[in-house]
From Swiss-Prot:
This is Intracellular endo-alpha-(1->5)-L-arabinanase. Optimum temperature is 70 degrees Celsius. The enzyme is stable for 30 minutes at temperatures up to 70 degrees Celsius. The record marks 147 as: Important for catalytic activity, responsible for pKa modulation of the active site Glu and correct orientation of both the proton donor and substrate. Binds 1 Ca(2+) ion per subunit. GO terms for biological process: arabinan catabolic process. Substrate binds at residues 27, 105, 144-147, 164-166.
Amino acid sequence: MVHFHPFGNVNFYEMDWSLKGDLWAHDPVIAKEGSRWYVFHTGSGIQIKTSEDGVHWENMGRVFPSLPDWCKQYVPEKDEDHLWAPDICFYNGIYYLYYSVSTFGKNTSVIGLATNRTLDPRDPDYEWKDMGPVIHSTASDNYNAIDPNVVFDQEGQPWLSFGSFWSGIQLIQLDTETMKPAAQAELLTIASRGEEPNAIEAPFIVCRNGYYYLFVSFDFCCRGIESTYKIAVGRSKDITGPYVDKNGVSMMQGGGTILDAGNDRWIGPGHCAVYFSGVSAILVNHAYDALKNGEPTLQIRPLYWDDEGWPYL
């Protein structure tokens, strides 16, 4: 049985998303278990936040107390415990948390996996289990194994999308037992800007009304108020593509309809995730707050869909 993100009967469109509390976050994803909400984001050991209502957030510690031992095998230069860009899904009674180990600007990288039976630290079953590496890249590869996102296709088959710069966004089929790449699975490139420096990363795929929507981030994060990050989207009838934007331009040729490029206060929105509860949807991302010297800040906003099935804010 597959549960993507069990948000229960919450109607996202009826909520007031004026977030409060501990909102420092980079590359956030969300899950909900019972009545409690959780955010996982980039930081020491993967940072966790929690909320009783999805609006008021507080820090709740970390997934890993230190860098998992095996990481140095794949990323020898990694000398701190800063883990990047997690993604979480719930499948067959287990939470699967994917995350990235890398150093800035290099593609010597690895995606790791941790599992847990619950997200509630008060539960006696609460324990993050290190499941080791999922897929890695080296300097000789033309892709970068960071920014994981797991998506289940309409037949319930899990896939992993990932990628940052280099040749762009990748997709590979997962084994349903291990939730790691299936034997002989082919690595597919599904989106690329088509020109250097190929500033595309952070894929997130969702399925809605027979279309797969590929959300990505264009341009540059991590520069505070100088960031140029923006969220773009395309869609396909097939999970493997071809993904095209609103104008029919292939995402393999630089296509991507801009969903959000920020404003004077919220600069460089990106690294987004999209969740559904019934017919309602939210967009989760970080943006750099110009009023706080460019601090990366959690954003959750209702995401709407036009008559042609394209998302808008």
